């Protein structure tokens, strides 16, 4: 009996998943640049010819992994933003979801710093790249929602421009996280601060940049304490 289209697609998805899992393992161990298609084929137990049936290049594999990673990040951040009723707790959750993301997937964290310009999207743009762009836009929308809630609650400056502030907040939090992990020993020697102390201190500075002056003292009651790293 011939295989149905649904079974063919299910089998193709199974093979793609195996290839992507092998590639993700190798990228984490050896970096993207240090991994070859031959190694992906060996670890996934497929021939290189079979790999190319499902993915045109190593770059396309990375595009799919990046989308998967960004979609998971969106789901974590969306939960953090929508399930916390306290503005301060929401900010803390947002910061430390991004800290956890850096720890879990530093490669994709770095890729998330690259902006995806919707004006550059064309018919030739790979679907995984388009999907990643959509995930980024959903993250930005949630951050803007978080900021608007703060404005509506009378906590955040009312004259805040949402789109620039969203980009600033994302860039500030992710930038501090990168510094904390990549310059950990320098921070310890020069500032006499642990990575956790550095993160807590700078997250508080970022938050203070959002708050109305009369609200700032409330933040001390909800300290942004970093979980064990």
Model features per residue range: what roles?
Residues 33, 47, 56-58, 86, ...:
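Short coil/turn motifs that cap or connect alpha-helices
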Residues 65-93, 124, 144-152:
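Amphipathic alpha-helical linker/stalk segments
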Residues 1-30, 35-43, 60:
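Basic, helix-initiating cap at the start of DNA-binding domains
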Residues 23, 45-55:
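Short hydrophobic/aromatic patch on the recognition helix
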